[in-house]
Every structure is written in structure tokens, then in C-alpha cells.
Amino acid sequence: MNFELTSAYKPTGDQPEAIAQLTEGVLQGVPAQTLLGVTGSGKTFTIANVIANINKPTLILSHNKTLAAQLYSEFKGFFPNNAVEYYVSYYDYYQPEAYLPNSDTYIEKDLAINDEIDKLRLAATSSLLSGRKDVVVVSSVSCIYGMGNPSDFYKNVIEIERGRMLDRNVFLRRLVDSLYVRNDIDLNRGNFRVKGDTVDIFLAYSDTLLRVTFWGDEIDGIEEVDPITGVTTAPFEAYKIYPANLFMTTKEATLRAIHEIEDDLTKQVAFFESIGKEYEAKRLYERVTYDMEMIRELGHCSGIENYSRYFDGRAAGTRPYCLLDFFPDDFLLVIDESHVSVPQVRAMYGGDRARKINLVEYGFRLPAAMDNRPLKFEEFEEMTKQVIYVSATPAEYELIQSEGIVVEQVIRPTGLLDPVIEVRPSLNQIDDLMEEIQLRIEKEERVLVTTLTKRMAEELTEYLLNNNVRCNYIHSDVDTLERVKIMDDLRQGVYDVLIGVNLLREGLDLPEVSLVAILDADKEGFLRSHRSLTQTAGRAARNVNGKVIMYADKITDSMRLTIDETNRRREKQLAYNEANGITPQQIKKARNLSVFGSPGSEADELLKEKHAYVEPSSPNIAADPIVQYMSKAQMEKSIERTRKLMQEAAKKLEFIEAAQYRNELLKLEDLMKEKWG
């Protein structure tokens, strides 16, 4: 099946040319291209058009789970009839195993798995292995982390066909081999039940119930059934049932793995003893022996991923299997916000290795644990044959890889121009800033101020508050959820000014902001580099009155580059608007920060008011005074209710709301322990 792009809008401005150039590059086999698109120019819509033109499976890599969710929503809107999948870490909470030798502290692994995201991950791999070309997978950096061997996964796909001879009990055994669990009472995802000649399977990768009926040893019927009403939704002549888990293995592979693990255990224990590490030798022997007993009895153990190399049959030092192995060789990789995402991919291997070295050296894990890891950056590069880097400020790496193939997209369909940039002396900068703030307050517009230090952000906030300016600050010490709330309050008008350090850059969509003030703009460094200045200035690009003021005593190279580039873009944007009779239109957007917006939201936002997800005002349950007087039974009921609310929010992929409920849940559980132990 081919991609079918659904949109009420046609490409405008720079989009047609960008789409044509990128499409031609991919079809000609160009290994790397860069889409340099300014904020609000419709980069997602451009990429969607390219995907529809080339008709190849595509992986879209984002640097965090929330942005990935937004992209997933938008691509679902653009391709409602195609397979748009979502692949991110399925942990609601994850504390990795670690050992701190300085304090002799061992930290056990702790986690909570999001069942809904697990389903979406399985759906992604199932779509890729189905052989269809019209697959888009939106992923976080999780795509480079280890998972099961795709060939083992595919071997356990069950293909059935109406009229085919198949013993019912053989079919049931195959379901068990594919890690489905029989449950004739409570049928949930990944379970199956048997009633006479009818087998109902709740598929692990969808909300579908599959009903297979037998007539003796013949498959008599295959149909999808609504799991709630029991009504048949679609009959089938043939069907593929994909496994219920990404990590598949066989009994033979398990026995072989145990034998190899025990051999390596003997060698490592002997090594520790030879260098006088008797305690580490004893610890390792006890831990691995216990794990092997658990695997023999139950088929799994805590931390079984540290033995993945043995189960996969890989040699020491070889890379793990990952999501990229499920794609065909000719897939397209799109890296969103590449100036952030590429360094993140590069850093994953080093961080993981640093943590595991201590676990191996102090006898907590076998050396094979080092092979349960994310891809090295070089391995990632080898596996990606065609890449499009997407960024408003591509880094040197992307430009070098693209060999000069940079496709520019600076025209906004709304006609909005890049903000005017002014440079003013730092002498009396606060007094000057106060005057500018008052002008914006009169127009009911908002102001962002970026400082170099946390202390300065806090002191400036205090000064402005003393002068009756409604303001707040955000920096790395402010909790993530609190930051989101503060930014939402800025949009709602609770504050007129928001002050920050390095948090006013990528991903902040605040159309009400008409002024960005950059203090100490001439202090060269990471926070005042050309890339940082350009990203920060872009926060004023969604307002028709957008303006940037740089307070400085001199113009640095970074400032000059940012100013020159912004002026060049403004000239091009003005010329286009004049030639086409376009009057810049202020972006209108529902005043609430969207975590998982409506489908096609970017395309909608460019040309009309967007109906965004409105976050409910969730109560601070644990802080309610009545909680202190609850009985144990009432407290347990409140905990269970909060857990359900968290799970419902997570199921809708409303991560911020789910995280709020999770925090409330933890507070209630702590209160429960405090009162009743």
C-alpha cells in the first residue's frame, strides 16, 4: 500500500521547493540532506509530503518522549490510512542498576512499565515485519537500545488461513510459544481463551480481539471482534498473529545460553580469585547462580537483559539488535531538532558503559552485561543509509554529512517575519528592560528574558516583583512539571514576564511572546553561541510584533552571525509577502500547553486556530487536608483511584497529566506508610 497524505492545505511559500529538492535527493540515493526550516514554517508538513512522494518506511527520531508524542499525533493526522507507529521507552519510571564504590552503595533496578506504550512498541515492530511499505515510526532515542532478534520474532509469527488444516491443540501451543498466556476468565492484552472449538486472542499489539473457529482440524472462520460488545467487525480469509513480546527465544536457545553463562561464570570467578578479589568472586557466583535457577524454573529473572548476548547468540563485543534491525535496508531516517538529537545519540553509549563498568568490576554482573547497551554512534551511522536532518540551527556535523545539500525553508504560510533584532548597551539594561516590559503589558503581550546564571534569574525576578511586574523564573532547579505549569501560566496571563537561563529554546511554542530580551549577549560561550542565540530569538517569531533586544557592550561573532542571518531571512520573507499580497497573521492558539495535540495540529496551526488538548486542572490530592483524617480503607481507595487516573492518562499518552497523578500517587503511598507502616 502506498502512503496517502490527507490534508486540507497545499504546500505554500518555500514548502513546494523544499519538498521537491528533498524528494529528488532521496530518490537519487543522496545519503544525507538537511532541512533548515525556521520556527513556524511547517517543517513537519514538508516531511510528510516527502514521505508520501518516496513511499519508503520512515523512522522519525525525536530527542524526547513528549515531542515524539506531538510528532506522532501530527503524522497520524497526515496519514490516517497508513501505519503510523510510536516507539519510545515503555517505562513510566526507571531507576537503572548501579554501584557506587566510594560509599559501597548498590542501587537495585526499579521500574514501572506503561502497558499502553508496550502495546504501541509491539505495533511498531509488527507493522515493520508485515512487509508493508507505508510505515512511519516516530521514536525517541529508545530506537538505538537493545531488543530481541528480529529473526526470532518473525519465526514466531503465526500465519493462519481459512480452510487450512491445523490441529487446535497445535495452534494453542504455538500461541504459548509466541508468549500469549491462556486465561479463560479475564481476557486482557496478550491473553487467549478457549471455548470448545473457538479460540479468542486479545492481540498484544492492538485493541483487537481475534476469533478463530475450528471445524475439527480445519480453520473454519477468522474474524476480528469488538472486545466489549462481541460484535464481529471484520472477517478475514488469512491473518498473521505477531508475538506478544519483543524478546523471543526458544527452549533450545535458553539451554544453550545457560550453559554459556555458567562457563563464563567459572572463568570470571577464577579471574577474580587470581587477583585477590575473593569477595567479588563470591558475590558474582551467588548472584549468577541464583539467576540461572530462576531462568530454569520460571524462564526469566530480574535483570535478564544483562544476559541478552547469550540468548541472541552474539559474539562478545558485537552490537545488540535494535529497532533499526526491523526496518528494510532502504528506509529513510528523519532526525528532528538534529542539533540536539544527534549529540544525544552520540552520548548514550558512553553513559551506559560508565555505569556498567562498576557493576562488572565489583562482581555484580558478568562482563557480558556490557553488551546489553545502546548502539555506538559509529554503529548508528552504519545502519542509516539515508538521512534528513531537520533543524532551524543545524550543527556542523549535519552540514558536513550533507556535503552542502541544505534545503532552506524560511517562508511561513502565516506571513510572519523573523523578529527584528536590536542591540542596546548593557549600561542601565534593567531600567531599559522595565520600559519595554511596560509597553508589552499595555498590549497584553508577554516577555521572555534570558540570563546567564540561575542567581541572576532569581534576583531579576525579585526586582521585577518589587516593581509590581507579574513574573516568574525557570531554570534547571525548577521541577519539570512546575516549569510546564509556569509556562502555561505565562500564556494564561498569570505572569507577564518569564525569566530563564537555558530553558527558553527548542520546543517552546508561545505565540503571545512579542519580546525576547537577552542579557549579557556578548558573553561568548555555550549559552551565547550563534546556535543558542538563533534558537532563543526564534521564540519571538510566532508573534506579529516579535522583537529581540540583545543587551551588550560589543557585537560578538555569534551576535553578528545571528543578526545577519535573521536580517537575510526577513528580507526574503518580506519580498515573498509583497509579491503575493500576504499580510502577516498572528498565530492564534488555545491557551493551554498541549502534550498530545489533535491530529495534523502543526498544519492547522499555520493557517487557523488550533483545537489543542486542554489539560484538566487536576487536584493536588495528597495536599488536601481531608487526606490526613482518612481511615486506612479510605486511603487505599484513594490510592487505587489515583492509580487508575494515572493509567487512563498514560493510555491517552497525556504524559504530563499522568506524571502529575504519579507524583500524587507516590505522596499518598508515602503518607500511607507513615501512618500505618
Curated annotation (Swiss-Prot):
SMART domains given for it?
DEXDc, HELICc
The listed locations are: Cytoplasm
Q: Name one GO biological process term.
A: SOS response
> Do you know which InterPro entries this protein is assigned to?
Helicase/UvrB_N (IPR006935), Helicase_ATP-bd (IPR014001), Helicase_C-like (IPR001650), P-loop_NTPase (IPR027417), UVR_dom (IPR001943), UVR_dom_sf (IPR036876), UvrB (IPR004807), UvrB_inter (IPR041471)
Q: Per the entry's comment, what about the domains?
A: The beta-hairpin motif is involved in DNA binding.
What does this gene product do? Answer: The UvrABC repair system catalyzes the recognition and processing of DNA lesions. A damage recognition complex composed of 2 UvrA and 2 UvrB subunits scans DNA for abnormalities. Upon binding of the UvrA(2)B(2) complex to a putative damaged site, the DNA wraps around one UvrB monomer. DNA wrap is dependent on ATP binding by UvrB and probably causes local melting of the DNA helix, facilitating insertion of UvrB beta-hairpin between the DNA strands. Then UvrB probes one DNA strand for the presence of a lesion.
PANTHER family the UniProt entry points to: UVRABC SYSTEM PROTEIN B (PTHR24029:SF0)
What name appears for this protein in its UniProt entry? UvrABC system protein B
Q: Which organism is it from?
A: Bacteroides thetaiotaomicron (strain ATCC 29148 / DSM 2079 / JCM 5827 / CCUG 10774 / NCTC 10582 / VPI-5482 / E50)
Task: Give the encoding gene's name.
Answer: uvrB
